[in-house]
Amino acid sequence: MGGLLLAALLALVAVPRAQAMWLGRLDPKQLLGPWYVLAVASREKSFAVEKDMKNVAGVVVTLTPENNLRLLSSQHGLQGCSQSVTELLKRNSGWVFENPSIGVLELRVLATNFRDYAIIFTQLEFGDEPFNTVELYSRREAASQEAMGLFTKWSRGLGFLSQQQAQLQKDLTCAHKILS
């Protein structure tokens, strides 16, 4: 597992300097508002088995008065749609958020055009299972070719295998509970 984490870290460091500087100036307010989560790459143990049953999720991003990131999400669960609120604290270095007390070790934006899509990297640890994800956030119900291409590029670049990647099912029922 340490080798995978090192590979992911090296891939993040290998980002072209111009792009890394560009994202360093990212204003969190540009990420605010409603998003559809259309694709996911995950190293979670059960993801490869469950990925074909996962539906599009909805996320509404807001900032707290303390400049923490608040994520309201709605996704399909075992008993229908479930909603949750996650608050992430801003780190001092760069545009990175975290909340280790709930298992979110890092959340950062890998790529975005500020209007249509964002590629989000998250390092998580639940129980004794550390893993990371890459998610494609989209302002629309369908992703652009540019967004899908970047999602695929980042996922592969960070070492995700094809069975660890999924375009989510187009059932928007749960997403629309908070996005409509």
Swiss-Prot record:
<keyword id="KW-0964">Secreted</keyword>
<keyword id="KW-0732">Signal</keyword>
<dbReference type="InterPro" id="IPR022272">
    <property type="entry name" value="Lipocalin_CS"/>
</dbReference>
<feature type="signal peptide">
    <location>
        <begin position="1"/>
        <end position="20"/>
    </location>
</feature>
<protein>
    <recommendedName>
        <fullName>Epididymal-specific lipocalin-6</fullName>
    </recommendedName>
</protein>
<comment type="similarity">
    <text>Belongs to the calycin superfamily. Lipocalin family.</text>
</comment>
<dbReference type="InterPro" id="IPR012674">
    <property type="entry name" value="Calycin"/>
</dbReference>
<dbReference type="Pfam" id="PF00061">
    <property type="entry name" value="Lipocalin"/>
</dbReference>
<dbReference type="InterPro" id="IPR000566">
    <property type="entry name" value="Lipocln_cytosolic_FA-bd_dom"/>
</dbReference>
<dbReference type="GO" id="GO:0005576">
    <property type="term" value="C:extracellular region"/>
</dbReference>
<feature type="disulfide bond">
    <location>
        <begin position="81"/>
        <end position="174"/>
    </location>
</feature>
<dbReference type="GO" id="GO:0007338">
    <property type="term" value="P:single fertilization"/>
</dbReference>
<comment type="function">
    <text>May play a role in male fertility.</text>
</comment>
<keyword id="KW-1015">Disulfide bond</keyword>
<dbReference type="InterPro" id="IPR002345">
    <property type="entry name" value="Lipocalin"/>
</dbReference>
<dbReference type="GO" id="GO:0036094">
    <property type="term" value="F:small molecule binding"/>
</dbReference>
<keyword id="KW-0278">Fertilization</keyword>
